[in-house]
Amino acid sequence: MDKYDDLGLEASKFIEDLNMYEASKDGLFRVDKGAGNNPEFEETRRVFATKMAKIHLQQQQQQQLLQEEALPRAGRSPVNGGNRQGASGKLAADGAAKPPLAVPTVAPGLATTTAAAQPSYPSQEQRIRPSAHGARPGSQNCGSREGPVSSQRPALHGLSPSCEDPSCLTHGDYYDNFSLASPQWGDKPEGCPSVSLGVGSGWPGCPGNDSTLPKSCGDHHPYQPQLSTVCSGRSFESGISGQDGGIGGHSSEKPTGLWSTASSQRVNLGFSSMGLENGTSAQPKGTTVSAPMVPSSASQGACPKRDSGLGYEASGRVFKPLVDTQPWLQDGPKSYLSVSAPLSSTAGKDSTQPGMTTGLDPKFGCVESGTSPKPSPTSNVHPVMSTPSELSCKESSPSWSTDSSLEPVLPGSPTPSRVRLPCQTLAPGPELGPSTAELKLEALTQRLEREMDAHPKADYFGSCVKCSKGVFGAGQACQAMGDLYHDACFTCAACSRKLRGKAFYFVNGKVFCEEDFLYSGFQQSADRCFLCGHLIMDMILQALGKSYHPGCFRCVICNECLDGVPFTVDSENKIYCVRDYHKVLAPKCAACGLPILPPEGSDETIRVVSMDRDYHVECYHCEDCGLELNDEDGHRCYPLEDHLFCHSCHVKRLEKGPSPAPLHQHHF
């Protein structure tokens, strides 16, 4: 426990360096960009990994010394064939609590399992050796003896071959290899050679567990130099070949144990995982192959396999709880699951090995051929937390593998086949369609986009006074009476014809075309002519704030129509043309008595006003000398007795005699 406390202290120091991680709102973790390049953090992680590797190596060396001392005692004292569950469980717990050791030598006829990181593998003759003695009849009591076999190997063998130094591992990979070190338990009778698949733990099976066929218990086989106990004869032995990271060192599994009787196989559910190892026999009975499977906490599943040519039968149970293996290894024996497994009597006949399921989904237990399974009446399950996953069932193939380089081949099978390791699949949830609000919003957005594309903002004139919508483009705009309309909105209120470019009448807030206005009964609201007093039903002429018929608007002198012609009126509102106005109303010259008219080509008249009299410009001069009079010096007018004189002439008139009338001097 002191060693584990030291590891806990080292781990707590390492966790303190992780305070740079920042918790995000979505529940995940994100790291600061600068923290990933922190040399202090990288140095701490490297030092921590190096220390952990050294501590782990020291533990392995100490356990190797203890193992070497225990091996001779285990070889000299084989266990007799008594059904002692407590003692065997204790041995299994002691063996599993220690990290595994690699065994350099293997007895003939025994199963051999090598870690995935080791470069060398046993040959086909060592891995698959049919018994030369053949099948021997044995007693039923021999199979009921429990034989837990434990083998240990260094956990460093589970590392990748390209990275033997634990300090080069990442944080997650190092803990996977350290905490999930898997011991190898394996021992075979001479007549029951087995094949190690190199992926996960192996279950070497012997066809001697058929309770209906007698087996021989008289033969003993050489013991493997490990902590092992094997019953004499053809007992159904238990063996576990653990490999951590069978493929690249990433897959780690913990030791498991199989307790079998002559008519049943009992599986301890407290184990964390069970791998796969195929056991073959020279008898034509068949071969029991354990297949990987992960049941739920209260369920188990099995899938028997059958080879049509050789009569091989495969079944498997794999349990992967999410708990550590050390507490239950120290608590003593657990309850087990007993499942009967009858074998076929001939090689050509279909044989099945049942898979017992308790509250399991049908996909976790399937039988491909043969009879229905018969579970044993004694079935005890030790509850553990586990994660269910699917079991892949493949037909006509007793070979199970995940890597072509580590794929073993059973005797007699033409080609090896692959099987997918159990994995937990996440089913995608149902896709939810858009809601009603989202559909409406999308429709409005598309409509707005279409309007903006069809009508650029540069052609926007304003809002129509009739429909209150925007007016885009000069071709749709129509302006009348100071208001803006759409071309389609400015129509006659009676016939709905467009009035753009046509005469229209605006009556009582409504717009009418000329025809509808004349013949639709709106005459009572029409204007009357100022001259004749009749209603204006046709064209109207407005002048001086009054309405006229165009034919009524004429000059009172010449009677010519003044529509579109300049005109003027007098004080009595009589209409004159400009020419007649000047003739009739033009002022008359006080000298000659003629009217003062504007010159030709002009509407303006030029006149001289003196003594409240009007004169032509040429008529305004001295009556005696004829000097043109004006405002200049020497040309000023000096009237005398209503006559126009210059200054000299005026003096002369005064010297001759006084005039009875007063003289008035005007200056212009």
UniProtKB/Swiss-Prot annotation:
Q: Where is the LIM zinc-binding domain?
A: 462-523, 527-587, 587-656
**Where does this chain mainly localize?**
cytoplasm
Biased composition range(s): Polar residues: 111-125, 138-153, 278-300, 340-356, 369-405
GO terms under cellular component: adherens junction; cytoplasm; focal adhesion; nucleoplasm; nucleus; P-body; plasma membrane; RISC complex
Look up the record and give one Gene Ontology term from the biological process aspect.
negative regulation of hippo signaling
User: Which parts of the sequence are annotated with region: Disordered?
Assistant: 74-160, 239-258, 277-309, 340-414
Q: Which InterPro entries does this entry report, sorted A to Z?
A: Ajuba-like, Ajuba-like_LIM1, Ajuba-like_LIM2, Ajuba-like_LIM3, Znf_LIM
Q: What induces or represses this gene?
A: Up-regulated during osteoclast differentiation.
Q: What does this protein do?
A: Adapter or scaffold protein which participates in the assembly of numerous protein complexes and is involved in several cellular processes such as cell fate determination, cytoskeletal organization, repression of gene transcription, cell-cell adhesion, cell differentiation, proliferation and migration. Positively regulates microRNA (miRNA)-mediated gene silencing and is essential for P-body formation and integrity. Acts as a hypoxic regulator by bridging an association between the prolyl hydroxylases and VHL enabling efficient degradation of HIF1A.
What's the protein here called? LIM domain-containing protein 1
